[in-house]
Each structure stands twice: as structure tokens, then as C-alpha cells.
Design a protein with these regions (language model features):
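Conserved beta-strand-loop surface patch within small alpha/beta domains used
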Residues: 1-104, 113-166
Length: 166
């Protein structure tokens, strides 16, 4: 089962990254899954969200991440907020168990017509899950078909360059 990145994470494998200076790589099928999910939510006027699994690697530049899969379950959502249904957590954990990758390394959610950024609530959510460890948030706005990736630390959010792996 993938686990959330933590200080107790196993030794990180050394592997040279595909593009210098980029710390986030996302499998194309994950992009398709997230954007399809966001489009469905948009058609129902509801935000969506899910978790991202993959692996952390390191090279001479430092640590970088490959997102290989995503997981979600039933959601309680409206046009400005979303959360996992309490009764759907077992389904979420089962979904994570089937994911590629060895860690939960991020999360995704949508904003409906307000652009791609992390709100104060999003930042608190992200910091509550990942703290200052490696962790990424991807925000999708299906109204204009955009998405952006972010990381957070005590100083706030930072937009992160992302490469899609085909």
C-alpha cells in the first residue's frame, strides 16, 4: 500500500532526472484521469478531488517526484468546497492499495471558474497532510481547461514546473 511521505520514508533511490531543474513529473494517464474527473464535476457544478501516488527519487540536484496514479472515492462537494465522504474512506484506502507507486505524494482538486491557485483552506489542507515534506497539489479549472501544480511550505504556495510523461 502506498504511504504518505514522512520522515520515516525508506531510503530514496538515486536516478538522474529526465529534465534538469524540474522536480515534478506526471504520467499522462494521470493527467487524463484528473481532467476527466474535473470535467464531470464541472458538469455537475461540483468541485472534485483525489490523491496522487508515485515515487520519490533523488539525483545530484536533490529530490524529485514521479506521479504514477491517482485515487479517489465518494465526495461531499459543492461549487466551492470538497471533501471525502466519511463513509467512503474505506473505498479510498482500497483505491490507494491498487495504485502504482509506493507513496501518496500529492493531491488534486478543482476550482470552478476561479483559476488555478491554492486558497488559504487549500494551503492548510496541504500543510496538514504533507507539512514541509515533499508533496504537490495540482489544481484544475475545467472552465478554461487549465491546470497548475504547487508546493507549499511555511512561507506559502509556490507554482511548480511539471513535465508530463508519455
Amino acid at each position: 500500500m502506498p504511504k504518505i511521505i514522512s520522515a520515516e520514508s525508506p531510503e530514496i533511490e538515486y536516478r538522474k532526472r529526465p529534465v534538469k531543474g524540474v522536480s515534478l513529473y506526471v504520467a499522462e494517464e494521470v493527467i487524463v484521469t484528473m481532467t476527466d474527473h474535473a470535467e464531470k464535476g464541472y458538469n455537475e457544478n461540483k468541485e472534485i478531488m483525489g490523491l496522487l501516488t508515485g515515487q520519490t527519487l533523488k539525483d545530484d540536484e536533490g529530490i524529485y517526484v514521479r506521479i504514477l496514479d491517482s485515487a479517489t472515492s465518494d465526495l461531499e462537494a459543492d461549487e466551492v468546497s470538497v471533501r471525502f465522504c466519511e463513509g467512503g474512506l474505506e473505498e479510498l484506502f482500497d483505491s490507494i492499495d491498487k495504485c502504482k507507486g509506493d507513496m501518496v505524494i500529492g493531491w488534486y482538486h478543482s476550482h470552478l471558474g476561479i483559476g488555478c491557485y491554492l486558497s488559504d483552506v487549500d494551503i492548510r489542507t496541504h500543510m496538514g497532510i504533507f507539512g514541509d515534506e515533499i508533496g504537490f497539489a495540482i489544481v484544475i479549472d475545467p472552465s478554461d481547461e487549465t491546470l497548475a501544480a504547487f508546493s507549499c511550505d511555511k512561507d506559502g504556495q509556490k507554482k511548480v514546473p511539471m513535465i508530463v510523461l508519455t
